[in-house]
A protein has these predicted regions:
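N-terminal intrinsically disordered, cationic/polar leader segments
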Residues: 1-100
Length: 100
């Protein structure tokens, strides 16, 4: 991961092979912030595991088996009651046939 600061904003590049949640949680610890808005993210992902809450309130995890284009990423970072960084992220992907 590489990052730079411009005023109060951080710009982050996540390196190939780094996991998005873990990398952003590590950034929160490195920089020392308690809360942040994630306003935008794009790029190419592979070996993607994502999850969602179904209509019965059950959290379902699924894999995207092929590399995909991350066309939108947003969310937030906050601290849990025990002080650990927690990420809540929403994403949209596109396959190589432009299906989102």
């Amino acid at each position: 991961m590489e990052w730079t600061r411009s005023g109060e904003d951080l710009f982050v590049r996540i390196d190939p092979g780094e996991e998005i949640h873990a990398t952003l949680q590590a950034l929160a610890d490195e920089v020392g912030f308690d809360a942040a808005a994630i306003t935008s993210g794009i790029g190419r992902t592979r070996d993607t595991l994502y999850g969602y809450m179904n209509e019965d309130g059950v959290y379902i995890r699924r894999n995207l088996d092929s590399p995909s284009e991350l066309v939108s990423l947003s969310g937030n970072i906050a601290r849990t009651q025990d002080g650990k960084a927690f990420t809540h992220i929403h994403c949209c992907w596109s396959d190589d046939d432009n299906n989102v």
